[in-house]
Each structure stands twice: as structure tokens, then as C-alpha cells.
């Protein structure tokens, strides 16, 4: 369905975001790594509690909720799929960044999850993590690496992805139940998206 021009009402209790899909079809020249003592750890068969904890710490302020709502069996099947790789950015011995690379599509890699905790925003850790993501993705037989971001994300996210070499190719509107109204997310998060009941 294509939305008509003009305003479209969103029912109370719902949230709506404009989602931008971005891609690259050739390996980019990576920007130089920033200074930092981070490391990357691959997490084979991640536990659901570990994953959801890091997912919340990275994304709760930006209304990441899909993996919190996802039933345990479905999330476990996804996380343990052989073509899906999960990594943690480690800072001072603690997991502070999340990277999910999905190679299930033929000849492509989707960066399904990408982000760092609030403690590392603005430190260069995200840039460092993106360099690792692109190194890993393009070391495989892929012709395309893609991801998506939305208007709920950090205000610098879209420009960051473009600086990293991605170009926008599609836009959608996503409408969902507000996760702050059913306890999926705390009521006080994401103040940039007002709760309307």
C-alpha cells in the first residue's frame, strides 16, 4: 500500500517511523580507525538473556523492541542459524556494542543489528565497529551489504551510514504498537517519540 500525499493519522497507542534502507554494492575504502582499546568477540549460539540484555542496553532509547517481543523459540532459531553471526564490541571487559551479520540471502549480507551503548556514543566506537562489520561482510562472497535505519534512531545514524559508504535505495513507513504501553520498554525511554494513549 502506498500512503497518499498529505497527513495520515496514526491511532493512539501506535508509533510510526520512516525507515530508510541503505546498501553498498562494492567494498568501500574504510575510514581510518579511531583511537580506542576496543575488541570484537564473536558470540556463537548466544544465550537469549545475554542477547536481550545487550540489545536493550544498545537500543532501548531508540525504541528497539522487535527482539524483545519475539518469542523465545523464534529468537533462538534466528540467533542460532548457521548463516547468522553475532558479535559483541568489548570495552574494558564488558560487552558494549552489538553487531549482527545475516548471510542468509544469496550473495548478500544484511547488517541486522548495529549499535553501541550510550556510554560509547560519540567515542568513535561505532565507527570502529562499522569498520569491523564491513571487513567481515566483504571477506565473504557477497555482492551487496545492506541495512536499515529509522527516524527513531540516533539523529546521527543516517549520516553515519552514508559516510560509511551506504546509499539509500528504499523508504517505508513502519507502524507498530508502542512498546512502552505494554511493558516491552520502560515508559520513560525515547522521549523524542511521545507516548499517545
Where are these regions (language model features)?
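Short amphipathic alpha-helix that is part of the acyltransferase structural core
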Residues: 34-66, 187
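Conserved glycine-rich acetyl-CoA-binding loop
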Residues: 117-131, 140, 152-156
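Acyl-donor-binding surface of acyltransferase catalytic domains
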Residues: 1-39, 44
Amino acid at each position: 500500500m502506498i500512503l497518499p500525499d498529505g497527513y495520515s493519522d496514526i491511532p493512539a497507542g501506535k508509533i510510526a517511523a520512516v525507515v530508510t534502507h541503505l546498501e553498498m554494492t562494492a567494498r568501500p575504502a574504510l575510514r581510518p580507525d579511531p583511537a580506542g582499546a576496543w575488541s570484537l568477540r564473536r558470540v556463537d549460539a548466544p544465550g537469549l538473556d545475554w542477547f536481550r540484555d545487550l540489545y536493550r542496553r544498545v537500543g532501548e532509547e531508540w525504541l528497539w523492541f522487535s527482539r524483545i517481543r519475539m518469542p523465545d523459540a523464534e529468537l533462538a532459531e534466528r540467533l542460532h542459524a548457521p548463516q547468522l553471526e553475532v558479535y559483541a564490541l568489548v570495552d574494558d571487559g564488558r560487552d558494549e556494542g552489538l553487531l549482527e551479520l545475516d548471510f542468509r540471502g544469496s550473495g548478500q549480507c544484511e547488517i541486522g543489528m548495529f549499535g553501541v551503548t550510550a556510554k560509547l556514543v560519540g567515542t568513535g566506537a561505532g565507527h570502529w565497529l562499522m569498520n569491523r562489520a564491513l571487513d567481515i561482510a566483504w571477506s565473504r562472497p557477497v555482492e551487496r551489504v545492506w541495512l536499515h535505519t529509522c527516524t527513531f534512531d540516533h539523529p546521527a545514524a543516517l549520516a553515519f551510514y552514508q559516510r560509511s559508504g551506504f546509499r539509500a535505495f528504499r523508504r517505508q513507513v513502519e507502524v507498530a504498537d508502542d512498546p512502552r504501553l505494554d511493558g516491552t520498554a520502560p515508559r520513560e525511554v525515547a522521549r523524542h517519540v511521545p507516548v499517545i494513549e
